[in-house]
Each structure stands twice: as structure tokens, then as C-alpha cells.
Design a protein with these regions (language model features):
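Juxtamembrane low-complexity tails/linkers enriched in Ser/Thr-Pro and polybasic
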Residues: 18-37
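Preference for long, amphipathic alpha-helical scaffolds in soluble/luminal domains
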Residues: 34-38, 50-54, 60-488
């Protein structure tokens, strides 16, 4: 089966300005040496000077760009960080795909709802030109996971020893339930697994890896290096030759699974720059690009067929992970997503599951996060109005909905201002308090209990799903840097 040509990336580029040098008086001996020197010596000196000047002079494609600086100043943490900016380009490529007709599928917001369309296959031959879309920040977002930076961000955004201990306990629980082949399952063998579905190792493995990686672990470093190394090998074994991460017989979680797997591979590549991960990441992104609904602009259950806000949200996060890793996404693809979101909202501030459906809190938080990643400014009136709506519905354990909380946590963290302190105050200690403290499930979050999670009531999600989303929320301080905290 033909596969895409790998995207060729240019190295990072920066503008270096020459600084004026003080002119020193010529000494008589130097003048005489130059005067008496043979012509070939003068020629060598001139060529050497030219090479030095060229070595210091990098030509940028966009001379209007300036350096990007991030302020993570915190009275508790002391010294902070600085960073450089990354800009990549690619060769022209092309892709052909098989077009799959629409199918009657149940409308659900849940990422693991059960319905089973017939499998399909995309024939990928190449990739379109990769062009960056100007957004508040792209390639700095993974820096927060680095030692030193991580501690600074914890202090700045409200993390503490208890929240970090909860993260370590949760990761230890995931490590205990990693299977011998390196994968994970959404069904078990832990208690309260997802019901009425197969193991879904693609989603389960990707979600576990994202939790480990969010805390700074990779296959090259970290307390859970071994688990990540085994997990990424297992995940790559699940990838098809044309880049897809779903298997024959899967239900309508196809693109949920594919987007989550794409996020995991792209983030790990971005954190390590391991070239063995670049090709799988590119193939996964290219498959997602060519699966976009050409009419509405989003994604749903089948390639190039229909759109909903829930699946589209995961696709946007996959693209953002790619961009953070330096793998650029065609700007027309991102612009088309914006066109879909324009149709899924009555006013730009609240969003429904599909076009012409009533807005919901979960889809509003999801879509507003997409808008942030697609370039909306923090002072956009529509973004502010939507964040004000979400602010009225802070997390409450009696109304558990980790899917809503997951999107709300990221969106509010990026908003900062009045939004993040209020949301965070309702979230952090509640998550820590209700984590399992003993027994075989120590470190996890029970999807059932006295106040079951919304998706546990439907037999969907399960303990690994609930635990991973809870870990993402407790890693929010450093998992992705707040995009509006970047000064250009």
C-alpha cells in the first residue's frame, strides 16, 4: 500500500544581530605585517572573514517575527525559564483517499459510545504542503514538563505537594495494570472497567501514555521510563501502514482512538525528538488530515463523512500536539475546522454536539478550547462570554462529569484571569480527596461510588478512563503551558 512521503522540516531559525565593535588603533607592527604579506595571505584572511560573517547570519522567511518569551514568575518558586521559538516547513506532498458514504450512527458526545460501522481504509500517497496557522503559541507548550520549569509552574498556577502525590499514585496504578505486551485495556482486570465493549487497547494505551508523558516521563527518562518505553512500542504495533490507529471491527470510537494515539506519539516525539517516532507521527497526522469531512469541516465516526464537536475536539488536540512537536498542519485544514465550529454555535460563545443542536456545557468547553488553539485572542468577546457561562458551572463532586471537567480545566487554565482561580479552587482538592487511598485500586478514581460519573452511569468510560482524565487535570499546571502567557 502506498504511504505518504515524510515531511521534511527545516531547522529552527533565529535572527542574530551584529553588535558594533570598538575600533582599536593599528599598531605599527601589524601594519607592516599586512603590507609585507603575500597576496594569498590577504585572500585567505578575507575569505575567512566572509565565512565567519555568513556563519552568524541566518536568513528567516518571516523577518517580522520576534523572539518569544514566557513569563512563569512565581513568588514561591524563584528562578524561571527562557525559551526559543521553533518554525518548520515542508516539501510539497499529495494524498489520495477513499471516500466513505455516510452511515446511520447514534449521536453521542461520549468518546467511547458503542456503535459499529463497517471498517474502511484510506490510501495515502503523500501529504499536502504543511503551513503554520498563526496562533498564540505552538511550540513552547511542552516545556512545562521539564525539570525546574515544572516546579515553577506548580507554584505559579496552584499545584501543591498533595496534588503531585496524587499524580504519582495515579501513575503507579497505571503501571500496575500495564499488560505484558506493553498495552492497557479499558475493561480491566481492575474493578469498574468499561462495560459492553472490547478492550480498546488503542485508546487505553494512548490515554495511559498521555498521563505518563504529561508528568514529564518519556521512553528515555523519568521515573516511569520503562512503562513508557513498553507502551509506545505496543502502540506503534497497533498502527496501520497508512497511519491509522483503529482496528477492524471497532465501534464508533475510531477517530477518538486515532486522535488520542496521534496525540501520544506526537507529544513523545516533541519531548524527545526521537527520529524513530517522527514517521509514525507524520503518518497519523496525514491520515487525520485526509479524513476530514470535506463538506462540514470536522470529524465524526467515518473518514470524510459527517462532523460532530466531540470527535472534532480530539482531532484539534491531535493537531495541536503535532504543532507543538514541530509537525505543521495545513492552514486550510484548521480554517475548515473553524468553519464547522461557526455552524455549531448560535452566537460563538456556546456550542452544540452537532450543527443545529442545543448547546451543552461539555461541548461549549470543548469548542472554546479548540478556538483558543485555532487562534482566538483571550479578549475575544465570544470567548469571554463562553468562559463566563462555564464559570457558572464549576466542578461539583455530586455532579461528576470528568469529560466536561477535562475540557473546562484546560480552557480555564488558558484563560487565567478570574477564570482559573475560581475553577481551580473547586477542582484540585476535590480530585485529591476522592482518589482511592488503599487496596488494589489505590491511586485510581472509581467511576461509580456514591456519586457515579456521568459516563459510568452509561456503562462507558470505566476506571482507566476516569483515572487518566483526572490525572490530566492534576497535571494541568505544567502539562501544556498557558497559551496566552507567551509574549511576542
Amino acid at each position: 500500500m502506498p504511504v505518504p512521503v515524510a515531511v521534511q522540516a527545516d531547522p529552527s531559525r533565529m535572527v542574530l544581530r551584529d553588535t558594533p565593535q570598538e575600533k582599536e588603533p593599528e599598531e605599527e607592527l601589524k601594519r607592516l605585517a599586512l603590507k609585507k604579506a603575500p597576496p594569498w595571505v590577504i585572500s585567505c584572511l578575507l575569505h575567512m572573514l566572509l565565512l565567519i560573517i555568513l556563519g552568524l547570519w541566518y536568513i528567516t522567511a518571516d523577518p517580522t517575527k520576534t523572539g518569544i518569551f514566557l513569563d512563569v514568575s512565581s513568588p514561591e518558586m524563584g528562578e524561571q525559564l527562557l525559551d526559543d521559538s521553533l518554525s518548520l516547513s515542508s516539501d510539497d506532498l499529495s494524498i489520495e483517499t477513499a471516500i466513505v458514504p455516510p452511515s446511520e450512527l447514534q449521536a453521542v458526545e461520549d468518546p467511547f459510545a458503542s456503535s459499529k460501522p463497517e471498517p474502511t481504509e484510506l490510501a495515502l500517497i503523500g501529504a499536502k504542503p504543511m503551513v503554520n496557522l498563526d496562533a498564540p503559541t505552538i511550540n513552547l507548550a511542552l516545556m512545562g514538563r521539564e525539570p525546574g520549569t515544572k516546579e515553577a509552574l506548580l507554584g505559579k498556577y496552584g499545584g501543591n505537594g498533595e496534588s503531585e502525590s496524587a499524580v504519582k499514585l495515579g501513575l503507579a496504578w497505571l503501571a500496575r495494570y500495564q499488560r505484558k505486551d506493553g498495552s492497557w485495556s479499558l475493561k480491566g482486570p481492575y474493578r469498574s472497567g468499561a462495560l459492553n465493549r472490547r478492550d480498546l487497547p488503542e485508546s487505553a494505551t494512548a490515554m495511559a501514555l498521555l498521563a505518563f508523558q504529561g508528568a514529564g516521563n518519556t521512553h528515555q527518562r523519568g521515573e516511569f521510563q520503562q512503562q513508557v518505553a513498553k507502551g509506545i512500542k505496543a502502540l506503534l504495533r497497533m498502527q496501520g501502514g497508512n497511519g491509522n490507529f483503529f482496528q477492524q471491527g471497532d465501534s464508533n470510537n475510531w477517530f477518538y482512538s486515532h486522535a488520542q494515539c496521534t496525540m501520544a506519539v506526537c507529544e513523545l516525539y516533541g519531548m524527545t525528538k526521537d527520529e524513530e517516532l517522527r514517521r509514525p507521527a507524520e503518518l497519523a497526522i496525514q491520515f487525520l488530515i485526509e479524513s476530514q469531512d470535506p463538506q462540514l469541516g470536522g470529524w465524526r465516526y467515518l473518514p470524510r463523512s459527517d462532523s460532530d464537536t466531540s470527535v472534532t475536539g480530539w482531532a484539534v488536540m491531535a493537531f495541536q500536539s503535532a504543532r507543538m512537536a514541530g509537525l505543521l498542519v495545513p492552514s486550510p485544514v484548521l480554517a475548515k475546522i473553524g468553519e464547522y465550529l461557526d455552524q455549531a454555535t448560535p452566537d460563538g460563545s456556546q456550542y452544540g454536539y452537532q450543527i443545529a443542536t442545543e448547546p451543552t456545557l461539555t461541548m461549549t468547553a470543548d469548542a472554546l478550547l479548540c478556538r483558543q488553539y485555532l487562534g482566538w485572542r483571550r479578549d475575544d468577546p465570544r470567548l469571554i462570554a463562553g468562559a463566563d457561562v462555564v464559570l457558572k458551572y464549576l466542578p461539583r463532586y455530586e455532579e461528576r462529569d470528568v469529560y466536561y471537567w477535562y475540557y473546562g480545566t484546560q480552557m480555564m487554565h488558558h484563560m487565567e484571569g478570574k477564570y482559573w482561580p475560581a475553577w481551580h479552587a473547586a477542582l484540585r482538592d476535590m480530585l485529591v480527596e476522592h482518589q482511592e487511598k488503599s487496596g488494589a485500586e489505590k491511586g485510581s478514581w472509581d467511576p461509580k461510588g456514591e456519586h457515579p460519573d456521568r459516563w459510568a452511569n452509561l456503562g462507558q468510560g470505566g476506571r482507566l478512563y476516569t483515572t487518566c482524565l483526572s490525572l490530566y487535570m492534576l497535571e494541568v499546571y505544567y502539562r501544556h503551558l498557558p497559551i496566552y502567557g507567551v509574549r511576542k
